[in-house]
Amino acid sequence: MIQKQTWKDEIRILITDEEHIGSVQISIPLYVSDIFGKADALIYALFVDYNHRRCGVAKRLLQQAEQQAKLNGVKTIGLEFHKEESDTFVLKFYLKNGYKPFNKESDLLIKKL
């Protein structure tokens, strides 16, 4: 399921899988800003129920999020990864799916779409 909301200054897209065991959200600003670093949009809140992890749900949700971003004109998408708060398999997942660190000091990972 995909829900799209257009706000005053951004588009927000919520994607949930068919079984309602995972979801992801995208924020696309409607103005030129450096708020997202070098990305045109930001993925946040990618979540999969603990009992359904490592079954491909997160990858499908991430691919759908990237597809929706492309449909809305996004060329570069980013997400924040906090080493102190997340397991290392999460970082490996994003790197495997084409995300690269913006720089050594930043928690921002980016991907060209």
Where are these regions (language model features)?
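Short coil/turn motifs at secondary-structure junctions
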Residues: 29-31, 51, 84-86
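Residue-level recognition of the GNAT/N-acetyltransferase active site
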Residues: 44, 49, 82
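Residue-level signal for alpha-helix termini/capping positions
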Residues: 70-71
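Acetyl-CoA-dependent GNAT
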Residues: 1-44, 104
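Conserved acetyl-CoA-binding loop of GNAT-fold acetyltransferases
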Residues: 94-104
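Conserved acetyl-CoA-binding loop-helix of GNAT-fold acetyltransferases
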Residues: 48, 54-67, 92, 96
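Conserved beta-strand-loop-alpha-helix junction that forms the acyl-donor binding cleft
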Residues: 78-91, 110
